[in-house]
Amino acid sequence: APSEMCIRDSAYSVVHISAGEIDRRGIQNANLDGARRAISELVVEPGFVLVDAFRVPGLTIPQLPIVGGDYTARCIAAASILAKVSRDRLVTQMAEEFPEYGLEGHKGYGTQAHMDAVRRHGASPEHRYTYANVAAAHQTYVRSTKP
């Protein structure tokens, strides 16, 4: 099928950035570093890069940032899908390691059920402590466990 050929014949790289690194460096810096790492890990060096929304400092390859790029450029949309599928697979693996959070149901998004689980069990090492809802839920847990 043509869509399978597009994927099979395309070079791509998926980079994982830990929650701890995102908390330490901030989401924007982590995203920029992830973009640089993903591009550097490509088997074939691209001659030009389309980027969703923002310029990536430090690239030696010409680039074009496109606001709303995942809606207007197929390659950016494909990158968004690859990132989401990779993230969902990672969360599915985490669900086995941390069953108390019910990750298989909400995929790690900040649902009421997820925040309730953080209030009951505290945040795991995979939670982003700089997210206000996670920090608040974790503080509730900390207060509830103090003697």
Functional labels for PLM-detected ranges:
Residues 1-4, 8-147:
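RNase H-like, Mg2+-dependent phosphodiesterase core
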